[in-house]
């Protein structure tokens, strides 16, 4: 499934992500845009450490989920393949776990590069949230 920006914003808001650990809704949506282009089936198997990234938030198999190809800390206690389906409830639950670590949203390189410290005040203006 490919979400629209506003559709994802509404979903994230309904799951309590606006202000979660101090990050505005716009930060979460911006991160998803640059990580996956809002695509729940996004997959990147080309990380230098042999790990892969899964789903709309590009959750990494070395730390957050279990894949069959290598060992994992599996901090979200889930199979990585679950992050590739249309239901993003489990992806959101795992993102909440990720952001509780000291790095916060800096765990996402695309967020650091494209969203961190930027003026996102108008980012969701058209969504009528």
From Swiss-Prot:
Keyword Protein biosynthesis (UniProt): no
EC number: 3.2.1.17
Disulfide-bond pairs as recorded: 6-127, 30-115, 65-80, 76-94
Catalytic site positions: 35, 53
Needed cofactors: Ca(2+)
Binding residues for Ca(2+): 82, 85, 87, 90-91
InterPro entries referenced in this protein's UniProt entry, alphabetically: Glyco_hydro_22 (IPR001916), Glyco_hydro_22_CS (IPR019799), Glyco_hydro_22_lys (IPR000974), Lysozyme-like_dom_sf (IPR023346)
Subunit structure: Monomer.
Name used for this protein in its record: Lysozyme C, milk isozyme
Source taxonomy: Eukaryota, Metazoa, Chordata, Craniata, Vertebrata
């Amino acid at each position: 499934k490919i979400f629209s920006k506003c559709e994802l914003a509404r979903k994230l808001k309904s799951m309590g992500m606006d202000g979660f650990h101090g990050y505005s809704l716009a930060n979460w949506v911006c991160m998803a845009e640059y990580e996956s282009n809002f695509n729940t089936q996004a997959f990147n198997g080309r990380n230098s450490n042999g790990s892969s990234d899964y789903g709309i938030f590009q959750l990494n198999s070395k730390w957050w989920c279990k894949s069959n190809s290598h060992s994992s800390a599996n901090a979200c206690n889930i199979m990585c393949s679950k992050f590739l389906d249309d239901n993003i409830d489990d992806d959101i639950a795992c993102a909440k776990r990720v952001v509780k670590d000291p790095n916060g949203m800096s765990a996402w390189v695309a967020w650091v590069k494209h969203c961190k410290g930027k003026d996102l005040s108008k980012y969701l203006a058209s969504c009528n949230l």
